[in-house]
Structure formats: structure tokens, C-alpha cells
Amino acid sequence: MATVRQSDGVAANGLAVAAAANGKSNGHGVAAAVNGKSNGHGVDADANGKSNGHGVAADANGKSNGHAEATANGHGEATANGKTNGHRESNGHAEAADANGESNEHAEDSAANGESNGHAAAAAEEEEAVEWNFAGAKDGVLAATGANMSIRAIRYKISASVQEKGPRPVLPLAHGDPSVFPAFRTAVEAEDAVAAAVRTGQFNCYPAGVGLPAARSAVAEHLSQGVPYMLSADDVFLTAGGTQAIEVIIPVLAQTAGANILLPRPGYPNYEARAAFNRLEVRHFDLIPDKGWEIDIDSLESIADKNTTAMVIINPNNPCGSVYSYDHLSKVAEVAKRLGILVIADEVYGKLVLGSAPFIPMGVFGHITPVLSIGSLSKSWIVPGWRLGWVAVYDPRKILQETKISTSITNYLNVSTDPATFIQAALPQILENTKEDFFKAIIGLLKESSEICYKQIKENKYITCPHKPEGSMFVMVKLNLHLLEEIDDDIDFCCKLAKEESVILCPGSVLGMANWVRITFACVPSSLQDGLGRIKSFCQRNKKRNSSDDC
């Protein structure tokens, strides 16, 4: 708990703390009295110890002349020995002059001896503790969430290792945003649809919490392709990207006391982070590298219990690049039914299939167990900054209506943010008019890059890729640390690689697999070849002395 000290007649009863006659100020617009008391937020005490209100400065004779004015100089400036503090106004958060007429910095008032101690509490001989009724997570779980379960946070940490003004450009192979490369520009039909929606002037308003009806209908029609029944607009909830879809679903499931959720390992860390913030217990099932990163179905029933509410599958898979077969997904649905749980199907990479295995929507099995599918424009249309996604309900038996899950999602969205109205308005035209040639071109680029990635990884004995990527934008790679000198783990590897080679990778630890890394191949082939070449050079420089470079 935080403690505020009180001494020498100095009272601390508000947001800020006043310093005593020895002249220390705590900084946030609060001045010290000579013998006096400060009553809170931005209040200066006069020379005789009187406080004159909110943000009101006293003159040298201890008189107050109004709201944020000192010695009647009209601009809120405090005077002492005939000097002013310029624009440092003594009016709440502003700055006042000290006893010698000199101005201090950053909203701090100096006292009789002119010393400032920032935001610290006043030093005192007598102490009085204040017990505050608020605090962060006592167990440290939430405090660690941002650092340990966030790709963004770990990417910033690793990027900080890059040498400033290095001889070579930084190659970001840590996250899936190829929009920075001109070759991955979105479809012209998508750009035109957004521009047209803006030009109408009709979509500058707030939308409905669950989304514009026309946009929801368009998504429902789009997602009904390939499933044995039609979705309606009521089956679709629009969100601010796939990330918000996760932020909506997890709290809804966490409303049941003692509930837990089954997550894949490796997996996308936002699920675990959101579960931690909502105190939803997480239990992991493994993906098997030697079986194309298939789900370890046999383990599902052993880790689930009566409090298990749902399981997450990611298909096509991030971070592994796998694409699941019809038979495999069917088995998952049957297990989910036996357990009485719903399936959350993260399908944001549904259009990005690179091999011969087709993408099978989990909604095909909605008649077996209820499915909440997460999708977005971000990946397939290469527009992550547009922030438009959805949650689609595949539930022909209306189980999620009966259990109030759909109602809870609606209620959550009614008190949450919305995707931009003009993007929603453009959505029907984007879905209808984007030509198949656009997707073929994007998939062609990704396929070429994935081939390069897999080939060059195979030529580097210090890393291992157990399965060629078949979809999404990523591949998981094992670090053969026993061949490397003074590399402690995957995070150490990534930080040193960034420092020496200006290549940014995602450590596997944040994805649930220590001593692995995730590489994105969603970039132009020449940059990818350069990056993989730098990785090999780094490994060769840091190899153990008795290790050869032969593959």
C-alpha cells in the first residue's frame, strides 16, 4: 500500500502532497507552505500557512488574490522579490516562483529553501500511514501478462537490441503484417469501397453495437459458402478486428465461476493473456510437431473436467503454418460434444492456404457441437490497420441461444468499442467485388516465400523445421542450442540476433514453446532470403568450437 507522510503542520489530504518548511515539493502542481497546510490538488499555501483554494497562489505577504492569480499580476504568476516566473503560472498544474523569485520545473513549487523532490511524499519526523483501497494484481499474474503473453511487448524488447544506425536495414520477421511491402497491397476493390463509403458522408455516425445490418448480412452470406446451412445476420457480430473478437468471447466464458478453457500449445498468446486478465483458468493441449502440428486429441479428455467451457483451435494455424483435415476436425468436434464444450475456431487465415490441403471451416461441424468462428479482413485482405473482424455463430441447434452465450456477446458489445462505421459500410462491396485474382496473387507470393523459407532453414543445421508450412504466414523452428555457444534460450537468441544482424524474430516462449522461434515468411522473397542468410551467419559465428558447418 502507498504511504503518505505528514509533518511540521503539513497536511496531505488530496491527490497531491505538500512539503514542509524545509522546502521539498512533491511535484504535481502542489506548493509548500512556510508553516502551512496544503489541501490537495494544485493548492499553494501562503507564507502564513493559509491555503486559498484550488490552484490559487499566494503572494509574498501571504495573501491570496483569487483563482490562480498571484500579487495581482493578472496572469497567474507568483512574485516574491520582484521577480516573476514568466509563463510558469501558479494555477493548479502550473508552476510557481519560489521564495527568491525563481521558477522551478514541471509544475513543482519550491519552498523556503527551494528544494524539490519530484513526486515523492514529504519527508517527516512524524509518520501517518494511509491505507489505499486499490492495488494491482497481488499475485503478479496480471502484472506479468503484458510482458510474458504479448507478441507486441516481446517484439519491442527484442527491437531495443538493434544497433542504432546499423549498417544494414532491419528485417522484421516477427509478426504478420506484410502490408509494409508494396507487393502485398490490398485489393483495389477494397480501397474503392472504403473511399466510396467515406464520400457518401452517411457513415460518420456511431453504428449499432453488434454492427451495421447490411455488413452483418454480407458476412453471413460470405461465411455460408462451404457449410451445409445458411447463416443469418443475427449469427454475425462485427468487432474491431480479430483481437476484439477474443476480447469479447473470453470474458463471456469467464462469467461461470471456476470455469476453465483449453488452449493449444504453441498458440496465439492473446487468448492466454485475456484469460489471465479475466481470471479464467487455462489448460493446455499440445500440437504434435511430427504429425503436422495436429492436435493431441487423446489428451483433451484427460485435461478437461466439468468446469471446462470451451477449446480453441487455430486453422490455418498461427504459429505453426498447419492446415487441418476434415477428418481431424471431425474428431475434434466429436470430443467437444462428449465434453459438452463449444469450439472457438480462429480462422482469420482461412483464405491463405498454400498447399493441396483445402481449408475446412469448423462451422461444417456446428451440428455436432456449437462453434464460434473468429474472422477478419486483416490477414486475407492485408489490411490489419482497418480493424474489422467478426464472431460468427455456427449453431443450427441454437444451443448458444439457450445458454445465453449469444445474448452475453450482444451485451458485451453494447458497452464496448465498434469497428469504424465507414469500414463496416464498405464491407458488403469488399466481400462481393474483390476478384479471385487478388487472392491468387497473394497466395502465390506467400507460397514462393514459404518455399524459400523452408529450403533455407533445411540448409541451416543450427535450426530445425519439423513441418513445411501449408497455410497462414508463419513457421515454427526449433533452435538446436546444444550446437551454439553462450546462447541461453530463445529470448537470448532473438536479442543477440537482433543486435548482431538486425533481424527480428518472435521467441517461442511467448507462444508456449521455449527454445523455438516463429518466423514469418510474409515478406518479399529477396528480404526473406537476406534475413535467413543473416540468421545462418549469426549461428555460424556463435557455434560451439567443436561444431562443423556441415549440414
Curated annotation (Swiss-Prot):
Keywords: Aminotransferase, Pyridoxal phosphate, Transferase. Residues 111-123 have a biased composition (Low complexity). Residues 86-96 have a biased composition (Basic and acidic residues). GO terms for molecular function: L-tyrosine-2-oxoglutarate transaminase activity; nicotianamine aminotransferase activity; pyridoxal phosphate binding. GO terms for biological process: biosynthetic process; tyrosine catabolic process. Induction: By iron deficiency. Only a trace amount of expression is detected when sufficient iron is present. Its EC number is 2.6.1.80. Expressed in roots, but not in leaves. Its cofactor is pyridoxal 5'-phosphate. Belongs to the class-I pyridoxal-phosphate-dependent aminotransferase family. This is Nicotianamine aminotransferase B.
